[in-house]
């Protein structure tokens, strides 16, 4: 994978009606990666996408493309195409003409247009649909047409603004894999916006977690999930148990009144820390085998596991386990060294 930086945002500030949407944002996006901007509504992720597309100019700061300042360059002069949640397809044009639209604006000859459109429809799995009316296409097929229309122009960067939001769950999961396949096959940069954590973890090479107009953490899906930088990321990416603890020395932490071996180091002796434990990383055992002992408050069957809320040492723990327990049952809880993640309280 090419590791060169294709897009850089430098000290970006965006304000709407006196409200700061992006607050000194700095971000590098690497070429030929699938990068996801992840965050809740209002975090600034779509504003960031619009800046890259050229639909919006910052109040201050710069947008760089391969080191060149493109802050004031209009969208049609940028090597960028955008796919929106509302696909904005032309209902009066068939599939072929929708995909060919941008090529016709470039005044390419008919043979070239025909070849490029047919090649692209084959890539997105719509070969043979050239003359189909848009109104006869399913939601997933319409999305493929929108993607084909963007990719046929051979952009260096494809921007995707929550394009799966209108699809049902099964189709959304299928399209997640399809988008990742397309990105690898086309070998270009995809920048994807979503609030869906699972979507981000499934598709991305790099995840950018945003909150309050700032980047909270950048990393691989594995890093973001297993090594959250702060309490916001730990809580936003999947379910987490976040408890106060004390780091006695390297590889030894205490929380909930019990000392636990861990794999973390580099903290001050007796430093107050926050401890993150994922629900699936807690082993349910008998009370005599448990490092912690708690009482099950409630149990919900989730299909692949049981979700339990367990009262222990004055706080409620969330546990995902394949073992079925009953409300009121006393259980033991074991947490291995590799399942404990330590964060400085200043990071939380």
Language model regions located:
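Conserved structural motif at the start of ABC-family nucleotide-binding domains
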Residues: 7, 22-24
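The feature captures the beta-strand-to-loop junction immediately N-terminal to the Walker
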Residues: 38-40
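ABC-family P-loop ATPase nucleotide-binding domain
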Residues: 1-13, 287-289, 346-348
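Helix-to-loop junction immediately C-terminal to a conserved catalytic motif
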Residues: 53
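ABC ATPase nucleotide-binding domains
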Residues: 34, 75-85, 89-232
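Non-catalytic connector elements of ABC transporters
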Residues: 240, 251-348
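Conserved ABC transporter NBD signature motif
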Residues: 61-69
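Conserved coupling/switch loops of ABC nucleotide-binding domains, chiefly the family-specific signature
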Residues: 59-62, 112, 212, 244
């Amino acid at each position: 994978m090419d590791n060169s930086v294709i897009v850089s945002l430098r000290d970006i500030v965006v304000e709407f009606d006196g409200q700061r949407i992006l607050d000194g944002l700095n971000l590098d996006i690497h070429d030929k990666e699938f990068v996801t901007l992840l965050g809740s509504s209002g975090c600034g992720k779509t504003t960031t996408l619009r800046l890259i597309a050229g639909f919006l100019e910052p109040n201050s700061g710069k947008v760089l493309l391969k080191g060149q300042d493109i802050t004031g360059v209009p969208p049609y002069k940028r090597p960028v195409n955008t796919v929106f949640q509302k696909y904005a397809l032309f209902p009066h044009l068939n599939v072929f003409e929708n995909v060919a639209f941008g090529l016709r604006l470039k005044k390419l000859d008919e043979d070239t247009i025909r070849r490029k459109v047919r090649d692209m429809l084959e890539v997105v799995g719509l070969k043979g649909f050239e003359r189909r009316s848009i109104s006869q296409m399913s939601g997933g097929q319409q999305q493929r047409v929108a993607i084909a229309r963007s990719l046929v122009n051979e952009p260096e960067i494809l921007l995707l603004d929550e394009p799966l939001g209108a699809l049902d769950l099964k189709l959304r999961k299928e399209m997640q894999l399809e988008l990742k396949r397309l990105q690898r096959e086309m070998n270009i940069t995809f920048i994807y916006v979503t609030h869906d954590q699972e979507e981000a973890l499934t598709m991305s090479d790099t995840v950018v977690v945003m909150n309050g107009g700032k980047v909270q953490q950048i990393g691989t899906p594995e890093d973001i999930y297993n090594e959250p930088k702060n309490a916001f990321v730990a809580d936003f990416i999947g379910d987490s148990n976040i408890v106060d603890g004390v780091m006695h020395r390297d590889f030894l932490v205490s929380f909930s009144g019990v000392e636990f071996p861990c794999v973390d180091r580099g903290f001050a002796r007796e430093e107050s820390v926050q401890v993150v434990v994922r629900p699936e990383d807690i082993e349910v055992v008998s009370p005599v085998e448990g490092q912690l002992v708690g009482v099950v408050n409630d149990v919900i069957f989730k299909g692949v596991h049981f979700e339990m809320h367990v009262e222990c040492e004055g706080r409620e723990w969330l546990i995902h386990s394949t073992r079925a327990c009953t409300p009121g049952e006393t259980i033991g809880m074991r947490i291995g060294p590799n399942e404990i993640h330590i964060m400085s309280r200043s990071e939380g």
